[in-house]
Amino acid sequence: MKFYETMFILKPTLVEVEIKARLDFFKEVIIKNGGEIETCLDMGMRNLAYEIKKNKRGYYFVIYFKAQPSLILELERNYRINEEILRFIVIKYESKKEQSAWQSLVNKANNKPEPKPTKAKKEDVAPEAKEQAQTEA
């Protein structure tokens, strides 16, 4: 199996349910044709560098997957016939260096930063300290 990354941009006029349906459809195409999805990034709504089909914004998605080369033709065919796709690209990672870079991208996408613990306010800590001081005395 080869390592791939695909990025596609959906029209900004779609509602959330339609966006999820399109994303699930493309994931299903990859899985049905023997691919293994490693991770999927929803990059959200972003401004386009230039106007595409009278749209200035679009929903960006990136999918990292492993598959046989024959899957790419089917995936690109589905991208082309879907009118909600503004642009798409499929990138193949061939060399060992590229494959290790692909793996680091997948790891970075899967390891989302955890929220930092909030510090307790002095007001919250003070009553507890007073109670402990009173019980010790």
Curated annotation (Swiss-Prot):
Give an example GO biological process.
Answer: translation
Q: Where is the composition biased (Basic and acidic residues)?
A: 111-137
Q: Which keywords does UniProt give here?
A: Ribonucleoprotein, Ribosomal protein, RNA-binding, rRNA-binding
**Disordered as annotated region, ranges:** 104-137
Which GO molecular function annotations are given, in alphabetical order?
A: small ribosomal subunit rRNA binding; structural constituent of ribosome
Task: Please provide, in alphabetical order, the Gene Ontology terms of the cellular component aspect for this entry.
Answer: cytosolic small ribosomal subunit
Q: Which InterPro entries match?
A: Ribosomal_bS6 (IPR000529), Ribosomal_bS6_CS (IPR020815), Ribosomal_bS6_sf (IPR035980), Ribosomal_S6_plastid/chlpt (IPR020814), Transl_elong_EF1B/ribsomal_bS6 (IPR014717)
Q: Does the keyword RNA-binding apply?
A: yes
Xref: PANTHER family: MITOCHONDRIAL 28S RIBOSOMAL PROTEIN S6 (PTHR21011), SMALL RIBOSOMAL SUBUNIT PROTEIN BS6M (PTHR21011:SF1)
Protein family (similarity comment): Belongs to the bacterial ribosomal protein bS6 family.
Say what the protein does: Binds together with bS18 to 16S ribosomal RNA.
Q: What is this protein called?
A: Small ribosomal subunit protein bS6
Q: Which gene encodes it?
A: rpsF
